[in-house]
Amino acid sequence: TQLSGGQQQRVALARIMAYQPDVILLDEPFSALDGYLKDHMQEELIEMLEDYDGTVIMVSHSRDEIYRFSQRLLIIDRGEITNHGDTKEIFDHPVTKTAAMLTGCKNFSDVKVLDAHTLEATSWGITLHVACELSDEIHYIGYRAHQFEPIWGEREENCIAFRLSSKAELQFERNFYVKPETEAFHRDDILTWLVQRACWQTIEEKGLPDYLKLHERDMLFLK
């Protein structure tokens, strides 16, 4: 009898645990499984590891798997370690552009630090003002797609004017792909703005906002 992919995974995990190893290496353990089976296998793995006292090293390109399973995270870029530390801390404060990309950030701009509290996001064509003191080591700014605040009417501080390039409607969200614009010229850089289903009706009633606002608390200042 040929075992299914899920059954093969269960047998392999059971054999590993039977040896009571000091270290377990899991290399993309769920990559070949469909979404439904993957969720069940992850639950089973968590249960199997509850009483395991050794170290588990998981290699994965899935940020959801890493966030769910790991307490500590190490990021390798082109053979070099760029970040290491507490997983949730790195997700919240990625420090480097590579880490921000791997933790799901989609929007980046090169920056010029103008003074201790002002920077120019050159790819977006805007100047941002912040209360915190900026370091000269900052080379990029990142902003997660779901954290933009839509603004209708009068422009506020740290807002991007934009025009719609395209959009994609998914089951629980809509992705708007927009191009920043200034009075002088249009930028070619595409920004992703993610809108959850709960906010769809507002946009359908009011139309697209005039601006997207960036809040300082959500800005990622990156090396």
Locations of the language-model features?
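ABC ATPase nucleotide-binding domains
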Residues: 1-98
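Glycine-centered flexibility sites
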Residues: 5-6, 79, 85, 104, ...
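A generic structural signal for ordered secondary structure
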Residues: 17, 49, 67, 81-91, ...
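C-terminal boundary and immediately downstream tail of ABC-type ATPase nucleotide-binding domains
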Residues: 92-114, 142
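Non-catalytic connector elements of ABC transporters
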Residues: 106, 117-223
